[in-house]
UniProtKB/Swiss-Prot annotation:
<dbReference type="GO" id="GO:0005737">
    <property type="term" value="C:cytoplasm"/>
</dbReference>
<comment type="similarity">
    <text>Belongs to the UPF0235 family.</text>
</comment>
<dbReference type="InterPro" id="IPR036591">
    <property type="entry name" value="YggU-like_sf"/>
</dbReference>
<keyword id="KW-0597">Phosphoprotein</keyword>
<dbReference type="Pfam" id="PF02594">
    <property type="entry name" value="DUF167"/>
</dbReference>
<protein>
    <recommendedName>
        <fullName>UPF0235 protein C15orf40 homolog</fullName>
    </recommendedName>
</protein>
<dbReference type="InterPro" id="IPR003746">
    <property type="entry name" value="DUF167"/>
</dbReference>
<feature type="region of interest" description="Disordered">
    <location>
        <begin position="1"/>
        <end position="33"/>
    </location>
</feature>
<feature type="modified residue" description="Phosphoserine">
    <location>
        <position position="89"/>
    </location>
</feature>
Length: 126
């Protein structure tokens, strides 16, 4: 049956709220399975281990180990486990084994807000 002339779709699409832009995602994210991931910008070969900056893209971490044979990756996981007060086995390198841009996955069930807070406290200690 053809539509009547001048008929409008009253009531349809009226309940839709205007789309709000999503808040910027920080370096700490939760994947669909519930695991927590941290985007890391590693700086190997530094004098000492330190969280140098927390931006919306990544957490900058200076690592006091050379970037050879995975030494810096192992030291990064060890240092983050100490900072986040987790077991070493709960901090695993997920992506970026040969890159400065890395993703570290946390196997412990810790809220992302708490993780971000602990990382920001380390930046303030500098």
């Amino acid at each position: 049956m053809p539509k009547k002339c001048g008929a409008t779709n009253k009531g349809k699409n009226q309940s839709k709220e205007p789309e709000r832009p999503l808040p910027p995602l920080g370096p700490v994210t939760v994947d669909p399975k519930g695991g927590v991931s941290i985007a890391i910008h590693a700086k190997p070969g530094s004098k000492q281990n330190a969280v140098t900056d927390v931006t919306t893209e990544a957490v900058s971490v200076a690592i006091a180990a050379p970037p050879t044979e995975g030494e810096a990756n192992a030291e990064l996981c060890r240092y983050l486990s100490k900072v986040l007060e987790l077991r070493k086995s709960d901090v695993v390198l997920d992506k970026g084994g040969k890159s400065r841009e890395k993703v570290v996955k946390l196997l412990a069930s810790t809220p992302p807000e708490e993780i971000l807070e602990k990382l920001k406290k380390q930046v303030e200690k500098k």
